Amino acid sequence: ELGGDVIHMDDFFLPPALRTQQRRSEPGGNVHYERFLTEVIPNLSSGRPFSYRRFDCSRMIMGEEIPVKNNGYVFVEGAYSCHPLFGDYMDRRVFLDIDGKTQEDRIRKRNGEDRLQDFLQLWIPLEEAYFQAFSVWEKADYIIL
């Protein structure tokens, strides 16, 4: 076990008030990158504990404070963690890929059949457009298939 903290990009889900057509047309625009830039990025190199607020998707409101000890490894996980607006804040970039069938099976199990269609028609195409627009695969130090 490495220890350390995990910061989930899903905690920076874009709130409804910011979901404009213009924003959704930007590659990587469906993550609240402004909040990640102010609540996380400046704190990572400090070595001091900090916290950020988690967006609660089930209630569409800001949720609880998430403490980050920041005294060792900090893992930032999620599709949009490599957004170019964040700069070069990572020591290593690891891209984890998955085949379509396994991805669908996992989404179906986690979110149900009804929500699967949302992922297939909206969220996955947005992620794919972001990966392509910003060459996420090419910039990864490691790719795990």
Which residues does each predicted region cover?
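Glycine-rich phosphate-binding P-loop
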Residues: 1
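Conserved beta-strand scaffold positions in the cores of enzyme catalytic domains, especially
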Residues: 4-6, 93-95, 141-143
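Conserved nucleotide-sensing/catalytic segment adjacent to the nucleotide-binding pocket
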Residues: 5-8, 14-67, 73
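Active-site donor-binding loop signature of nucleotide-sugar glycosyltransferases
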Residues: 11, 98, 145
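Short, basic, glycine/proline-bearing loop/turn elements
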Residues: 46-50, 100, 114-119
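Small-molecule kinase domains that catalyze NTP-dependent phosphoryl transfer to phosphate-bearing small molecules
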Residues: 61, 83, 112-145
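ATP-dependent NMP and nucleoside kinases share a basic, alpha-helical "lid"
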Residues: 61-110
